[in-house]
Amino acid sequence: MNKKAPVFLHDYSVMAVPIRGALGAAALPTLLFFLCQSATAWADDYFDPAALEFANPQQKMADLHYFAKSGGQQPGTYPVTIWVNNQQVAEGPIVFVDDRGVLQPELTSAKLAEYGVNVSAFSTLTRLHDGETFTRIEQFIPDASSRFDFATQRLNLSIPQAAMNVQSRGYVDPARWDDGIPAAFVNYNLTGSQTRQSETQSRSSYLNLRNGANLGPWRLRNISSMQYDQHYRWHSQSTWLQRDVKSVKSLLRIGDTFTSGEVFDSVQFRGVQLMSDDEMLPDSQRGFAPVIRGMAHSNAKVTVSQHGYVIYETFVSPGAFAINDLYPTAQSGDLEVQVKESDGSVRSFTQPYSTVPFMLREGRSKFSLSAGRYHSSQHQVRSPQFVQGTLFYGLPAEFTLYGGTQLAQDYQAWALGIGRGFGELGSLGSDVTWANTATPSDRHYAGHSLRVQYQKDFASTGTSFSLASYRYSSGSYYGFSEANALESQSERLDNKRQREEISVAQSFGAVSSLAISAYSQTYWHSNSNDETVHLGFYSAWKGVSWGVGYYYTQSSDREKADRSWSFNLNIPLGGWLDESSVGYSTTSDNNGHSSQQVSLYGAVPGRGDLDYSLQQGHANAGQGSNSSAALDYHGGYGSAQLGYRHDSASNQLTWGASGSVVAHPHGVTLGQPVGDSFAIVRAPGAADVAIEDGTNVHTDGRGYAVVPTLTVYRKNTITLDTESMSNDTDVDLQGQTVIPGGGAVVLANYQTHIGNRVLFTLRNRDGAVPFGASVQLRQQEDDTGVAPQGMVADGGQAYLSGIPQEGVLEVSWLQNNIARQCSLHFHIADQQQQNTVKTVAGLCS
């Protein structure tokens, strides 16, 4: 024992635990005693390896000088998490070298820049060559330091704040945005039905496909659909190529797309577009899709269209319904909702949808540039070439100035607006658009439109209030879409005159809320108008929820307005049906129709991936009783639905399926429907491993999985559930952080060790293999993975994971400054296959 100081050991860990693998090591009674001690030291913490006592007095010891000082460990590559000033910034393998008895990380200026260090401010760093490594960070950045916590595999870097880049909260360096791997995918959503009415039978189906292919920063996308109703109709709605332009925080699109809908009404066109992408900003505002609420009087089919294209189709039961999973294809453009009842009657209404320009901070700007040929789903509509540009700029005193122009051969429009935040009073914006229109018959129209927008959230009262009003001051104002529909002098277009929207949401505590929304659209040259009103109150108490609603719909193509009321009640059950509820609902309308429904729905007991619903109801006006039953499976490879509906007018069988098929460099993987950016988990050989925070997502038989949604330009952590791993599976890192670029398919690659967990007892001619010797599995020539490795403990014992049924274990150590080595050919007996940890003893020669 060194006489300069008393024995003091701390921060030692995994002396006999493999560098990679799971589970603990062999027992080290004497060593563990020292590891748990703490005493005052009068000099550097130091431990003399010669002080170790072994159960076998004849036990020899390898050179353990790496462990002589507190925190000492063997040099090598370790999978670690990197923390800068107590914030995690990265994770991955780092090479550690022995520097005066302490493990120090090998760093580069590029790595420090990735961690947020202002590298350009230090000449000592800028003089380094690309890839040149260094270990002592304090020699390059004054007052900086590094500390490796071996027990938690955490590298802590302390860097003065003045040496860090000053960035907004949530900022992620664009250099870390991952363009992803080459991939191609198909996102599918299929619904269908077979209906029998009296003597007739009909079938219908709808297939929506969202296809994509990625190569580098480029993304190819396509949206197609197929409808069958007596005959097939296939339609490719849009195809485009896109990539992000990091230098200007923008998105470039080439092909079929939509113009920005913040200043002018959004229109579809084929051409080129460059527009600011706020998702690249630290405090970005995310887009939204409206919730569509309506009423069905029977088992009905609901179809949602935008710009003339069907974007959503589903089947609903009698009563009030809400659609909240839309994927709109444009930034604005009212949604046309069609409800087809079981008796064949059809009702339609308009759901307003537009993005409201939000206020910009002082000095910030955003823009949109579009050029191409206008495209419409309607026939006999002109398709002129045009250009459009819009610009927003944040001024002092919470003002935002914005404007834009649309230019075509027979149409010119200019817009100018200003918005301002008024603190507690909310935000108000107003703009004026002037337009000149020429028709093919050489008629000319000039008009203007005034728009006012207001939005306010009253946090103290839980009220959210927004209002948007469009006023067309003359009958000679035409929007771009309306102007292109003016085909001849004899045709008179009922262009829009005045439009109002209002939406108010009021919460009462944490369990009740009131929602009010209204929309009105009037037209020139017509007495008809479109109006929609919805009032709803919803509440809950001890798990019991209820709500009442009022719906009013007036369409310009219908003479009579529809008025309806609804009430619903849901009561959760207990016992073996603790994941189920009983529901009751009733509806009535101004046409004398009324209905009542009783339902039982929830998760099938013992099956978290399978939901069911049973309904029984009765309606007047000759419709009689109705009933339905449905199953909804939502698994790791997609979802499937099957339902049966019956009423006095028809019997209907419905079905559906949704999911994704992804082709990537490592094969083909099935998954749930994917978003624009998603991840491929690669854990070779680790079958049926669950992904944390992923609903029913798990790896397939090859160890691959699709994580269906990621937040672009943000840190996303993908974590494997180690509790779901089999006994022969280990991973180096349980979680990984990915930062996908827009539309990227990123790879979360896990280093797996598939094989046995083995406790070896190693002997040589002199007895047990020395304590502290290194052990490593000899790999085959075609094996490119990391070989399992570890260290010998007391009694020649070494624990390793990922070990094959047979192989060669290589052992090396330093004794009296002489390098020594031996190898053990081993075979695990078949009778040990049921053991979680196998044991192998043998002579190392």
Descriptions of predicted regions:
Residues 74-96, 685-695, 766-782:
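Short, ordered, surface-exposed loop/turn motifs in non-cytosolic proteins
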Residues 99-107, 326-332, 704-730, 793-810, ...:
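Short Pro-Gly-centered beta-turn/loop motif in secreted/extracellular proteins
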Residues 177, 203-216, 235-248, 383-397, ...:
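Feature captures outer-membrane beta-barrel proteins of Gram-negative bacteria and organelles
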Residues 186-190, 222, 252-254, 367-371, ...:
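Membrane-embedded beta-strand positions of outer-membrane beta-barrel proteins
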Residues 19, 41-286, 589-662:
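Post-signal-peptide, soluble extracytosolic/periplasmic N-terminal scaffold domains
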Residues 161-163, 192-196, 217, 226-230, ...:
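Transmembrane beta-strands of outer-membrane beta-barrel pores
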Residues 93-94, 695-704, 782-795:
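Short, acidic Ser/Thr/Gly-rich low-complexity loop/linker segments typical of extracellular
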Residues 82, 292-294, 679-683, 756-764:
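A short, amphipathic beta-strand motif
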